Amino acid sequence: MDRQEMFQGKRWGLFNHFLCVPAGDGTGEPCSPEEWNARVDAFDVELLAAQLREVGADYFCITIGQNSGHYCSPNPVYDQLVGISPSKCSRRDLIADLAAALEPQGIDLWVYLPSGAPCADAQAVERLEWVDGQGQRLASFQRKWEAVIREWSLRWGERVKGWWIDGCYYPDAMYNFPDEPNFKSFAAAIRAGNPQALVAFNRGLEDPFLPQCPWEDYTAGEVGDWLPIPGQKVREQLQGKKLHVLSYLGQTWGQGQPRFPDELVAGYTKLILAQDGILTWDIPLEPNGAIPQAYRRQLQALGRMLEE
């Protein structure tokens, strides 16, 4: 099957930064493994699945982890590589539980993961041989990170439909090589458990709609606090990839109250859909995984307006 067929019937989805510190925080005080496990255990996947169905989301994307070194799924390969005990990977496999709750609702599950080691965890950075913010080859790190990703991909199999990989800021230094590790081997690790998994590699805000390599399926599309209107130039550079836009409904990633009026949210969503694109809105969640009421109301309005 052509992976582009996986986008059929998909219009918009939601994203959540499920983390122990605010999104993007590389220095904040992390929680203990027990505190992290308590947070993961408190997530009611059935409640969220029902609310996602109610508001009409076609897919849901959640962070496996980011900078602190806490991940919401077990990974023995990661634990062996970094040697941290007790593990900062959760005992509960939240990703597997989410997938099981979403599938009966007809909602796909995507996952987010950085392309680098957790920068706020010094031991993980050292053991994985990661150098943050440098345009280096880092071949040894890449091999280790591919092994970590492969373990998760095989664990979840076809239940995870898409991946959004953050922080691919140095493609020419790290990935654009004919010999492995490269984008091809990176994508192969991601698709080890599901050859049809959709993949995007995020190069940052500078050119969010420029595909990085042949092994991507959609644009990373991170646009932050601005809402661009993709024009003819963007359509010409897609190279057969799906146009995708990622922004947040709150004040920033995963925080604050809704910043837009309902009409703007619906209008911009319609604009992207009219260009055969898809749009992902980031929102915060309550500690139990529920959509906060202000966002739930706005998303219900979005669903109604899209049907008008």
Predicted regions and their residues:
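Mature catalytic domains of secreted/periplasmic carbohydrate-active enzymes
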Residues: 1-308
